[in-house]
Protein backbone atom coordinates (compact mmCIF):
# COMPACT_ATOMS: atom_id res chain seq x y z
CA UNK A 1 0.00 0.00 0.00
CA UNK A 2 1.41 3.38 -1.01
CA UNK A 3 1.85 6.29 1.38
CA UNK A 4 -0.84 8.29 -0.52
CA UNK A 5 -3.38 5.47 -0.09
CA UNK A 6 -2.55 5.20 3.62
CA UNK A 7 -3.11 8.93 4.13
CA UNK A 8 -6.33 8.78 2.12
CA UNK A 9 -7.67 5.90 4.22
CA UNK A 10 -6.71 7.72 7.43
CA UNK A 11 -8.48 10.87 6.21
CA UNK A 12 -11.61 8.84 5.44
CA UNK A 13 -11.48 7.16 8.86
CA UNK A 14 -11.17 10.53 10.64
CA UNK A 15 -14.07 11.96 8.63
CA UNK A 16 -16.21 8.92 9.49
CA UNK A 17 -15.42 9.24 13.22
CA UNK A 18 -16.25 12.97 13.18
CA UNK A 19 -19.53 12.27 11.37
CA UNK A 20 -20.46 9.60 13.92
CA UNK A 21 -19.32 11.25 17.16
CA UNK A 22 -18.94 14.96 16.35
CA UNK A 23 -16.09 17.26 15.23
CA UNK A 24 -14.50 17.42 18.70
CA UNK A 25 -14.30 13.61 19.07
CA UNK A 26 -10.96 13.32 17.23
CA UNK A 27 -8.38 15.74 15.84
CA UNK A 28 -4.76 16.12 14.83
CA UNK A 29 -3.24 18.08 17.70
CA UNK A 30 -1.06 20.26 15.48
CA UNK A 31 -4.06 21.49 13.48
CA UNK A 32 -5.56 23.25 16.47
CA UNK A 33 -3.87 25.74 18.79
CA UNK A 34 -3.79 24.63 22.45
CA UNK A 35 -6.93 25.66 24.33
CA UNK A 36 -6.43 27.48 27.62
CA UNK A 37 -8.15 25.75 30.51
CA UNK A 38 -11.22 27.65 31.65
CA UNK A 39 -11.24 28.31 35.38
CA UNK A 40 -13.31 29.95 38.09
CA UNK A 41 -11.88 31.52 41.23
CA UNK A 42 -11.74 29.49 44.43
CA UNK A 43 -12.74 32.63 46.32
CA UNK A 44 -9.23 32.92 47.74
CA UNK A 45 -6.38 34.73 45.97
CA UNK A 46 -3.82 32.61 47.85
CA UNK A 47 -5.43 29.33 46.73
CA UNK A 48 -5.81 30.62 43.15
CA UNK A 49 -2.06 31.39 43.13
CA UNK A 50 -1.15 27.96 44.52
CA UNK A 51 -3.27 26.24 41.86
CA UNK A 52 -1.13 27.95 39.20
CA UNK A 53 -4.00 28.53 36.75
CA UNK A 54 -5.96 31.17 38.66
CA UNK A 55 -8.63 28.95 40.17
CA UNK A 56 -10.39 25.59 39.86
CA UNK A 57 -10.54 24.14 36.32
CA UNK A 58 -13.86 23.66 34.56
CA UNK A 59 -14.77 20.13 33.48
CA UNK A 60 -12.46 18.42 35.98
CA UNK A 61 -12.57 16.47 39.24
CA UNK A 62 -11.03 18.06 42.35
CA UNK A 63 -10.45 16.31 45.68
CA UNK A 64 -10.14 18.34 48.88
CA UNK A 65 -9.10 16.21 51.85
CA UNK A 66 -7.81 16.65 55.38
CA UNK A 67 -8.58 16.07 59.07
CA UNK A 68 -11.96 16.98 60.54
CA UNK A 69 -12.79 20.68 60.96
CA UNK A 70 -9.76 21.75 58.92
CA UNK A 71 -11.68 23.99 56.50
CA UNK A 72 -12.48 21.63 53.59
CA UNK A 73 -16.18 22.46 53.43
CA UNK A 74 -15.48 26.19 53.87
CA UNK A 75 -13.16 26.17 50.83
CA UNK A 76 -15.81 24.33 48.79
CA UNK A 77 -18.58 26.74 49.85
CA UNK A 78 -16.42 29.72 48.81
CA UNK A 79 -16.04 28.07 45.38
CA UNK A 80 -19.85 27.77 45.12
CA UNK A 81 -20.21 31.48 45.98
CA UNK A 82 -17.75 32.41 43.21
CA UNK A 83 -19.57 30.29 40.61
CA UNK A 84 -22.87 31.94 41.54
CA UNK A 85 -21.29 35.41 41.29
CA UNK A 86 -20.44 34.60 37.66
CA UNK A 87 -24.06 33.61 37.00
CA UNK A 88 -23.39 29.87 37.20
CA UNK A 89 -25.43 27.13 38.85
CA UNK A 90 -24.04 25.00 41.68
CA UNK A 91 -25.23 21.88 43.50
CA UNK A 92 -24.32 20.60 46.96
CA UNK A 93 -24.65 16.85 47.56
CA UNK A 94 -24.84 16.70 51.35
CA UNK A 95 -24.16 13.03 52.09
CA UNK A 96 -23.21 13.97 55.67
CA UNK A 97 -26.53 15.83 56.17
CA UNK A 98 -24.64 18.63 57.89
CA UNK A 99 -24.89 21.78 55.76
CA UNK A 100 -25.51 25.00 57.69
CA UNK A 101 -27.60 27.32 55.46
CA UNK A 102 -26.79 30.41 57.55
CA UNK A 103 -23.03 29.77 57.31
CA UNK A 104 -23.37 29.24 53.55
CA UNK A 105 -25.23 32.56 53.34
CA UNK A 106 -22.48 34.29 55.37
CA UNK A 107 -19.94 33.11 52.79
CA UNK A 108 -21.88 34.78 49.97
CA UNK A 109 -23.93 31.84 48.69
CA UNK A 110 -27.37 32.54 47.27
CA UNK A 111 -29.08 29.68 49.12
CA UNK A 112 -32.37 30.29 47.27
CA UNK A 113 -30.66 29.19 44.03
CA UNK A 114 -28.38 26.47 45.42
CA UNK A 115 -29.39 22.95 44.41
CA UNK A 116 -29.26 20.71 47.50
CA UNK A 117 -29.54 16.93 47.77
CA UNK A 118 -29.29 14.82 50.93
CA UNK A 119 -29.07 11.28 49.51
CA UNK A 120 -29.79 8.07 51.42
CA UNK A 121 -26.94 6.01 49.96
CA UNK A 122 -23.69 6.24 48.03
CA UNK A 123 -25.34 4.89 44.87
CA UNK A 124 -28.07 7.52 45.04
CA UNK A 125 -25.56 10.35 45.60
CA UNK A 126 -23.33 9.36 42.69
CA UNK A 127 -26.32 8.71 40.41
CA UNK A 128 -27.51 12.27 41.16
CA UNK A 129 -24.02 13.62 40.32
CA UNK A 130 -24.00 11.64 37.05
CA UNK A 131 -27.47 12.91 36.08
CA UNK A 132 -26.61 16.54 36.89
CA UNK A 133 -23.36 16.48 34.89
CA UNK A 134 -25.24 15.33 31.80
CA UNK A 135 -27.61 18.32 31.85
CA UNK A 136 -24.88 20.77 30.69
CA UNK A 137 -26.57 23.33 32.99
CA UNK A 138 -24.56 22.75 36.18
CA UNK A 139 -21.20 24.49 36.60
CA UNK A 140 -20.12 23.06 39.96
CA UNK A 141 -21.11 20.07 42.09
CA UNK A 142 -19.72 19.62 45.61
CA UNK A 143 -19.96 16.19 47.25
CA UNK A 144 -19.61 16.25 51.05
CA UNK A 145 -18.15 13.76 51.70
CA UNK A 146 -16.69 10.61 50.11
CA UNK A 147 -16.51 8.91 53.52
CA UNK A 148 -20.30 9.35 53.88
CA UNK A 149 -21.07 7.66 50.54
CA UNK A 150 -22.16 4.37 52.11
CA UNK A 151 -23.02 1.60 49.61
CA UNK A 152 -26.49 0.00 49.76
CA UNK A 153 -24.93 -3.40 50.49
CA UNK A 154 -23.53 -1.97 53.71
CA UNK A 155 -26.71 -0.09 54.67
CA UNK A 156 -28.92 -3.14 54.15
CA UNK A 157 -26.57 -5.58 55.84
CA UNK A 158 -26.21 -6.24 59.54
CA UNK A 159 -23.67 -4.54 61.80
CA UNK A 160 -21.55 -7.71 61.91
CA UNK A 161 -21.31 -7.95 58.09
CA UNK A 162 -18.07 -6.86 56.42
CA UNK A 163 -18.54 -5.53 52.90
CA UNK A 164 -14.88 -5.32 51.88
CA UNK A 165 -14.06 -2.93 49.03
CA UNK A 166 -17.70 -2.07 48.27
CA UNK A 167 -17.17 1.70 48.51
CA UNK A 168 -13.99 1.59 46.41
CA UNK A 169 -15.79 -0.38 43.67
CA UNK A 170 -18.75 2.01 43.81
CA UNK A 171 -16.48 5.07 43.45
CA UNK A 172 -14.41 3.56 40.65
CA UNK A 173 -17.49 2.64 38.60
CA UNK A 174 -19.16 6.03 39.16
CA UNK A 175 -16.02 8.02 38.33
CA UNK A 176 -15.61 6.20 35.01
CA UNK A 177 -19.13 7.32 34.05
CA UNK A 178 -18.91 10.85 35.46
CA UNK A 179 -15.52 11.71 33.92
CA UNK A 180 -16.80 11.04 30.40
CA UNK A 181 -19.40 13.83 30.58
CA UNK A 182 -17.53 16.33 32.79
CA UNK A 183 -15.07 17.67 30.24
CA UNK A 184 -17.66 17.69 27.47
CA UNK A 185 -20.16 19.69 29.54
CA UNK A 186 -17.73 21.87 31.52
CA UNK A 187 -18.95 20.75 34.95
CA UNK A 188 -16.49 20.69 37.86
CA UNK A 189 -17.00 18.19 40.68
CA UNK A 190 -15.34 18.79 44.05
CA UNK A 191 -15.18 15.72 46.28
CA UNK A 192 -14.57 16.50 49.96
CA UNK A 193 -12.75 13.65 51.68
CA UNK A 194 -11.57 12.72 55.15
CA UNK A 195 -8.43 11.05 56.44
CA UNK A 196 -8.10 7.56 57.88
CA UNK A 197 -5.08 5.79 59.36
CA UNK A 198 -3.92 2.42 58.06
CA UNK A 199 -3.55 -0.16 60.81
CA UNK A 200 -0.09 -1.61 61.45
CA UNK A 201 1.94 0.88 59.39
CA UNK A 202 5.30 1.41 61.10
CA UNK A 203 7.30 3.04 58.31
CA UNK A 204 5.97 5.67 55.94
CA UNK A 205 2.79 7.72 56.10
CA UNK A 206 -0.09 5.79 57.74
CA UNK A 207 -2.68 8.26 56.42
CA UNK A 208 -5.06 7.31 53.64
CA UNK A 209 -8.35 8.60 52.22
CA UNK A 210 -11.61 6.61 51.92
CA UNK A 211 -13.03 5.62 48.53
CA UNK A 212 -10.15 3.59 47.14
CA UNK A 213 -7.58 4.64 44.55
CA UNK A 214 -10.06 5.65 41.85
CA UNK A 215 -10.53 9.21 43.07
CA UNK A 216 -6.76 9.74 43.41
CA UNK A 217 -6.41 8.68 39.78
CA UNK A 218 -9.34 10.60 38.27
CA UNK A 219 -8.79 13.86 40.19
CA UNK A 220 -6.94 16.54 38.19
CA UNK A 221 -6.24 18.44 41.42
CA UNK A 222 -5.88 17.19 45.00
CA UNK A 223 -5.67 19.62 47.93
CA UNK A 224 -4.41 18.63 51.38
CA UNK A 225 -5.94 20.97 54.00
CA UNK A 226 -4.46 21.24 57.53
CA UNK A 227 -5.00 23.53 60.51
CA UNK A 228 -1.68 24.99 61.68
CA UNK A 229 -2.63 27.35 64.51
CA UNK A 230 -5.53 29.04 66.26
CA UNK A 231 -6.49 32.68 65.78
CA UNK A 232 -7.31 34.39 69.03
CA UNK A 233 -8.84 37.68 70.12
CA UNK A 234 -8.08 38.19 73.80
CA UNK A 235 -9.07 34.91 75.47
CA UNK A 236 -11.44 33.90 72.66
CA UNK A 237 -10.56 31.58 69.78
CA UNK A 238 -11.99 33.24 66.66
CA UNK A 239 -10.71 30.93 63.93
CA UNK A 240 -7.63 29.13 62.68
CA UNK A 241 -4.83 29.45 60.17
CA UNK A 242 -4.93 26.80 57.47
CA UNK A 243 -2.23 25.46 55.16
CA UNK A 244 -3.41 24.14 51.79
CA UNK A 245 -0.96 22.03 49.81
CA UNK A 246 -1.55 21.14 46.16
CA UNK A 247 -0.41 17.50 46.27
CA UNK A 248 -1.53 16.73 42.70
CA UNK A 249 -1.96 19.10 39.78
CA UNK A 250 -2.33 17.94 36.18
CA UNK A 251 -2.63 21.50 34.89
CA UNK A 252 0.27 23.34 36.56
CA UNK A 253 3.24 22.80 38.86
CA UNK A 254 2.16 20.79 41.92
CA UNK A 255 3.29 21.01 45.59
CA UNK A 256 2.64 24.75 45.94
CA UNK A 257 1.10 25.88 49.21
CA UNK A 258 -1.36 28.55 50.31
CA UNK A 259 -1.88 29.98 53.79
CA UNK A 260 -5.32 31.31 54.66
CA UNK A 261 -7.15 32.38 57.80
CA UNK A 262 -10.61 30.92 58.38
CA UNK A 263 -12.69 32.98 60.79
CA UNK A 264 -15.61 31.30 62.54
CA UNK A 265 -19.00 32.19 60.98
CA UNK A 266 -17.26 34.32 58.30
CA UNK A 267 -15.06 31.95 56.30
CA UNK A 268 -11.77 32.85 54.62
CA UNK A 269 -10.53 36.26 55.73
CA UNK A 270 -10.00 38.38 52.60
CA UNK A 271 -8.30 41.16 54.59
CA UNK A 272 -5.75 38.67 55.99
CA UNK A 273 -5.00 37.50 52.42
CA UNK A 274 -4.51 41.05 51.15
CA UNK A 275 -2.23 41.83 54.11
CA UNK A 276 -0.16 38.67 53.51
CA UNK A 277 0.11 38.94 49.72
CA UNK A 278 0.65 42.70 49.86
CA UNK A 279 3.65 42.20 52.12
CA UNK A 280 5.03 39.27 50.09
CA UNK A 281 4.88 41.30 46.86
CA UNK A 282 6.40 44.44 48.41
CA UNK A 283 3.26 46.56 48.10
CA UNK A 284 3.02 46.79 51.88
CA UNK A 285 6.36 47.34 53.62
CA UNK A 286 7.00 46.33 57.21
CA UNK A 287 9.00 48.89 59.19
CA UNK A 288 9.53 47.46 62.65
CA UNK A 289 6.05 46.90 64.05
CA UNK A 290 4.47 49.27 61.51
CA UNK A 291 3.18 48.59 57.99
CA UNK A 292 3.73 51.26 55.36
CA UNK A 293 1.90 51.83 52.08
CA UNK A 294 3.35 54.23 49.49
CA UNK A 295 5.91 55.37 52.08
CA UNK A 296 3.33 56.21 54.73
CA UNK A 297 2.75 54.22 57.94
CA UNK A 298 -0.86 52.99 57.93
CA UNK A 299 -1.12 50.39 60.72
CA UNK A 300 0.84 49.11 63.70
CA UNK A 301 0.90 45.32 63.81
CA UNK A 302 -0.76 42.69 61.60
CA UNK A 303 -4.02 42.68 63.58
CA UNK A 304 -4.51 46.43 63.11
CA UNK A 305 -3.58 46.15 59.43
CA UNK A 306 -6.27 43.50 58.90
CA UNK A 307 -8.83 45.63 60.76
CA UNK A 308 -7.94 48.65 58.63
CA UNK A 309 -8.37 46.67 55.41
CA UNK A 310 -11.70 45.27 56.65
CA UNK A 311 -13.07 48.72 57.39
CA UNK A 312 -11.52 50.69 54.51
CA UNK A 313 -13.01 49.31 51.28
CA UNK A 314 -11.24 51.86 49.07
CA UNK A 315 -7.79 50.95 50.46
CA UNK A 316 -8.63 47.22 50.31
CA UNK A 317 -9.60 47.40 46.61
CA UNK A 318 -6.63 49.62 45.74
CA UNK A 319 -4.11 47.17 47.23
CA UNK A 320 -6.00 44.19 45.78
CA UNK A 321 -5.80 45.68 42.26
CA UNK A 322 -2.05 46.23 42.69
CA UNK A 323 -1.61 42.62 43.84
CA UNK A 324 -3.46 41.37 40.73
CA UNK A 325 -1.30 43.57 38.46
CA UNK A 326 1.89 42.39 40.19
CA UNK A 327 0.87 38.74 39.81
CA UNK A 328 0.16 39.27 36.09
CA UNK A 329 3.61 40.86 35.64
CA UNK A 330 5.29 37.96 37.46
CA UNK A 331 3.40 35.45 35.30
CA UNK A 332 4.41 37.21 32.06
CA UNK A 333 8.05 37.33 33.18
CA UNK A 334 8.07 33.61 34.01
CA UNK A 335 6.57 32.80 30.58
CA UNK A 336 9.32 34.74 28.75
CA UNK A 337 12.14 32.99 30.62
From Swiss-Prot:
User: What does the record list as coiled-coil region(s)?
Assistant: none
Q: Does the keyword DNA damage apply?
A: yes
Instruction: Enumerate the subcellular locations listed in this protein's record, separating them with semicolons.
Output: Cytoplasm
Keywords assigned by UniProt, alphabetized = ATP-binding, Cytoplasm, DNA damage, DNA recombination, DNA repair, DNA-binding, Nucleotide-binding, SOS response
SMART domains for the chain: AAA
GO molecular function ontology, one term from the record = ATP-dependent DNA damage sensor activity
- Annotated positions binding ATP: 66-73
Q: Name one GO cellular component term.
A: cytosol
Cystine crosslinks: none
HAMAP family listed in its UniProt record: RecA
Sum up the protein's function in the record's words: Can catalyze the hydrolysis of ATP in the presence of single-stranded DNA, the ATP-dependent uptake of single-stranded DNA by duplex DNA, and the ATP-dependent hybridization of homologous single-stranded DNAs. It interacts with LexA causing its activation and leading to its autocatalytic cleavage.
Question: What NCBIfam families does the entry give?
Answer: tigrfam_recA
Q: Which family does it belong to?
A: Belongs to the RecA family.
UniProt-recorded name of the protein = Protein RecA
Native species: Mesomycoplasma hyopneumoniae (strain J / ATCC 25934 / NCTC 10110) (Mycoplasma hyopneumoniae)
Amino acid sequence: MTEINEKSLLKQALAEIKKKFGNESIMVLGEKPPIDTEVFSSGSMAIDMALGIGGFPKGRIVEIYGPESSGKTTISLHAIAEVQKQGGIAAFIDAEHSIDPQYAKNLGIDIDNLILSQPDSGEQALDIVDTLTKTKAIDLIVVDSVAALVPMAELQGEMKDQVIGAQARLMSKALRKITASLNKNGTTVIFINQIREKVGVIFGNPETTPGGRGLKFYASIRLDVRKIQQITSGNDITGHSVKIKVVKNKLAIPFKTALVEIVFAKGISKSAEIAQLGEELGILVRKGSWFAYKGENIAQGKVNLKLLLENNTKLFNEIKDQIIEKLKENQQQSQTL
